[in-house]
Structure formats: C-alpha cells, structure tokens
C-alpha cells in the first residue's frame, strides 16, 4: 500500500514539474515576426523583444572554462617537465642549443 502511494506521489510531482516547465517556456515565447517595421521606433522595439527572448540563451558563460592561454601554458610546462624527467636512455640531458659532446 505504501509503495503504491509513493509511486503515485512521485508521478504527481513529476507531472507538476513538467507542467511548470512548459508554462515557463510558453511565457518566453519568441516575438512574432512582423514585416511592417516601417519606423526606427518599430525596429528598436523589435530588437528589444529579440534581446529579451534570446538574452538568457546567448550570453557568454564566463568562468566555465579556462582561457586558451592557461591551457597552452600548462601544456608547455608539462612538456618541459616531462622532457627533463623522462631521460630513460642513459644520456645526459642537454639544452636546446648545446652541441653534442664526444
């Protein structure tokens, strides 16, 4: 008995959340396309409507990913450290511009 009541409660909550999500999407409907944009005020109003509609969808997400320079810098540091520590051939580590010693 308790298990069926729990299943019914979960189904009701899921349907309520789905209905709330649909209501939010309906309130943010895209502004209609009007071909009767004759004045600058009409065009400005249309652009404002587009900005409010697409504003939350097209904003840049700062802080979500590291910058390209940080990634490249870390990659270079890893390569430098790997080159110094991965000398498995028994040779002496030399610099880039140093000649080979015989």
From Swiss-Prot:
Phenotype of gene-disrupted mutants: Increased NPF or NPFR activity dominantly suppresses PAIN-mediated food aversion in postfeeding larvae. Deficiency in NPF/NPFR signaling causes decreased alcohol sensitivity and overexpression causes a hypersensitive response to alcohol sedation. Controlled functional disruption of NPF or NPFR neurons rapidly triggers acute resistance to ethanol sedation.
Subcellular location per the Swiss-Prot or TrEMBL entry: Secreted
Keywords: Amidation, Behavior, Cleavage on pair of basic residues, Digestion, Hormone, Neuropeptide, Secreted, Signal, Stress response
Superkingdom of origin: Eukaryota
Pro-peptide positions on chain: 27-32, 66-102
GO BP term (any one): response to odorant
Gene Ontology, cellular component aspect: extracellular region
Tissue: Expressed in midgut, brain lobes and ventral nerve cord of larvae. Predominantly expressed in two pairs of protocerebral neurons in the larval CNS (at protein level). Intense expression is also seen in the fan-shaped body of the central complex and two lateral areas of the lower part of the central brain that appear to harbor the giant commissural interneurons of the giant fiber pathway (at protein level). Upon glucose feeding, two additional dNPFergic neurons are consistently detected on the ventromedial surface of the subesophageal ganglion (SEG) of third instars larvae.
Modified residues (Phenylalanine amide): 62
Record GO terms (molecular function): G protein-coupled receptor binding; neuropeptide F receptor binding; neuropeptide hormone activity
Secretion signal span: 1-26
Transmembrane among keywords: no
Disulfide-bonded cysteines: none
Physiological role: Integral part of the sensory system that mediates food signaling, providing the neural basis for the regulation of food response; coordinates larval foraging and social behavior changes during development. Required in dopaminergic (DA) neurons that innervate the mushroom body for satiety to suppress appetitive memory performance; a key factor in the internal state of hunger in the brain. NPF neurons coordinately modulate diverse sensory and motor neurons important for feeding, flight, and locomotion.
Stated family: Belongs to the NPY family.
Protein name per the record: Neuropeptide F
């Amino acid at each position: 008995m308790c298990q069926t009541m729990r299943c019914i409660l979960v189904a009701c909550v899921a349907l309520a959340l789905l209905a709330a999500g649909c209501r939010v999407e309906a309130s943010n409907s895209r502004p209609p396309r009007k071909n009767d944009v004759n004045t600058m005020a009409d065009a400005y109003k249309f652009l404002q409507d587009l900005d409010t509609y697409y504003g939350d969808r097209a904003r840049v997400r700062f802080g979500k990913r590291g910058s390209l320079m940080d990634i490249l810098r870390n990659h270079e540091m890893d390569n430098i450290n790997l080159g110094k520590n991965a000398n498995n051939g028994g040779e002496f580590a030399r610099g880039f511009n140093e000649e080979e010693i015989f």
